[in-house]
Each structure stands twice: as structure tokens, then as C-alpha cells.
Amino acid sequence: MLEFSNVSKSFWTGTQRKVILGDEYFRVELGTSLGILAPNGTDKTTLINMMAGLEKPDEGRIFRGCNISFPLGFIGGTSPRHTAKENACYIARLYSLDPHYIEAFCGWLVDIEEYFDMPMATYSSGMNARFNFALMLALEFDIYLIDEGMPSSPDVEFNKKAGDLLQERIDRTTIVIVSHQPQTLEQFATQAAVLRDWQFIQFNTLEEARQVYDFESQI
């Protein structure tokens, strides 16, 4: 279970204070994947980072009663000076996992051939995103955190393998995905919420959340 209890979060932009959450309570139960609709500018990445423990709330408490992933696309745990192979082995050891398995899994999924043995500083943004996505799926978590869906890739084979693996995770774990596009959430979410004007409003279905989100977007 992941629980936000009376959590508030804001930061200073240089000209004004921007509020992300204002004294909000919600929880994510294991087995119930949550899709969060959030317009651009609501700083949804901060919300995901708080779930992962990368950022602290200003007030309130966040309880993590299970194993929660780093956010998809988070590169803070990898070193651009090292190769993907070296990074995969390093992260595996941090999680007390078999480095050879994690290395092989990431190499198979990303499939970037000789680049796998080159420093990640030489990678394109797309290659970095694919590697971090592979690394997240290589590790076993109870809750997977995704910001704006799967990484965009023109590689049809990668999209197929990654999509199948993510669906397998959805079937047996919990996904929390945040996006400004309702269609991004359709294949992942069993429940939904809207983050807007520092309020977190939960709904039983994505369609209910979409109706409120679309209506407020027109105001």
C-alpha cells in the first residue's frame, strides 16, 4: 500500500509560490492500478517523485508499505560515464540481484548492440529512455511508477517486447501512471484520479475522471 496522509507540497518559482498538493489524503492499494490525469503545468513529476521517495512533502506523511519503483525515465541512479552494461550490474548489486541476469535482460530488451558497451553519455535521449525502462522492468517491484507512458521509440520490436512485458506486470502488480492525455491511461488504469488546482480527486472509473478533466480543461 502507498498512502498520502494530509500531504502538502509547494515550491518557490522565483516570482510566486506554486502549490502541487494542499493537505491531501489518498491511498493506492496493491492490485488496483491508478491512472492520474494532470494538465501540463501541474508538476505531476513532483507527485511521482514523492511517491518514489525522491522528494519529501512540506507537511503530512507518506507511508510506503511495499516495494515501489523509481519513476520511469529517472536517470539519477545511472552514471553517464559508464556503459549500460556497467550501470545494469551496479543497479543489480544495489538491489541484491544477480548482475548477470539484469545485464542480460536489459541487453535483450534494449537491443542497442555495440552501444550497450559504450558510455551512456554517447546515447541519444531515446536510447537513454529505453535503457531506463528496461532497467525498471528488470527489477521486481510491487508498484511501478510511470510518468507519461512508455518511452517513444520508432523500433517496432522494442515497442512490442516492452509493451508485452509491461502488460504482464500490470496483470500481477500495481501501476501508477500520470499523464495529461486520457488515452495514455486507458490500457493501464483500473481506477483514476484528477490532479488539478492542488487537489487530488479520485474516481471509480477512468471515464468519470475523463469527464471532469475534459470539462475543467475547457474552463
Regions found by a protein language model. Give the residues of each.
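A short, flexible loop at the N-terminus of ABC-type nucleotide-binding domains that lies
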Residues: 1-27, 33-35
